[in-house]
From Swiss-Prot:
Source organism per UniProt: Erwinia tasmaniensis (strain DSM 17950 / CFBP 7177 / CIP 109463 / NCPPB 4357 / Et1/99)
Lineage: Bacteria, Pseudomonadati, Pseudomonadota, Gammaproteobacteria, Enterobacterales
Function: Ring cyclization and eight-electron oxidation of 3a-(2-amino-2-carboxyethyl)-4,5-dioxo-4,5,6,7,8,9-hexahydroquinoline-7,9-dicarboxylic-acid to PQQ.
Family designation: Belongs to the PqqC family.
A biological-process GO annotation: sulfur compound metabolic process
GO molecular function: pyrroloquinoline-quinone synthase activity
Enzymatic reactions: 6-(2-amino-2-carboxyethyl)-7,8-dioxo-1,2,3,4,7,8-hexahydroquinoline-2,4-dicarboxylate + 3 O2 = pyrroloquinoline quinone + 2 H2O2 + 2 H2O + H(+)
HAMAP family registered for this protein in UniProt: PQQ_syn_PqqC
Enzyme Commission numbers on file: 1.3.3.11
Gene: pqqC
UniProt protein name: Pyrroloquinoline-quinone synthase
Pfam families: TENA_THI-4 (PF03070)
CDD domains: TenA_PqqC
Pathway stated in the Swiss-Prot or TrEMBL entry: Cofactor biosynthesis; pyrroloquinoline quinone biosynthesis
Enzyme class: oxidoreductase
Record key words, sorted: Oxidoreductase, PQQ biosynthesis
Amino acid sequence: MTEPALMTPQQFEQALRARGAYYHIYHPYHIAMHNGEATREQIQGWVANRFYYQTRIPLKDAAIMANCPDAATRRKWVQRILDHDGHDDSDGGIEAWLRLGEAVGLDREVLLSEQLVLPGVRFAVDAYVSFARRAVWQEAACSSLTELFAPEIHQSRLDSWPQHYPWIEEEGYGYFRGRLGQARRDVEHGLQLALAYCNSVEKQQRMLEILQFKLDILWSMLDAMTMAYTLNRAPYHTVTDQPVWHQGKLL
């Protein structure tokens, strides 16, 4: 087997972008939502479970900043936290997602309670936050490079959902519109970090594996939702139709 060679920055960027072939936009659950084939329950289930991911993004970014000794990087990275938590001029992405939840017919208190979060989704998201806390900050930061592929997925929802799901209130689409510009800005910074840090074969190959880890997380979340909302096989479905799984917040 041929040993991998050191890639130029251009080749390494191309290798990172090539991982977009495994982005969760190609998961059957996402394809169904895009094509107008998802049921109301499937849309609501996705919004409710994805909300858990949204609420953990600022925790992930705070962990990266806590491990980062470089003030210039922290000054840029903190914007990601503000984007989600909000600031004087913006309610933030988490509030925008709550409005999406309301637009698809969910009560915001139900979303905030996390009672609809499936164990498989919780485990996947928690693994991401745990990695960000334990990894060297450059690796944790670059695990966010799935943002390379995010603008396309946000735009696809804006293009297809109003047509396919007229029952979703227009106010719910604010999150996707806001992330179009934010994601492109974040990609530029994250890509700069990756290209500067990955200056050896070992670092380049490890970063590709880290990006795959993040792709695995996103795909696994949709696998859990598929079991629950498409195949009607939520956890413990063979013994009860009640959501008896743990609700988190154990530590």
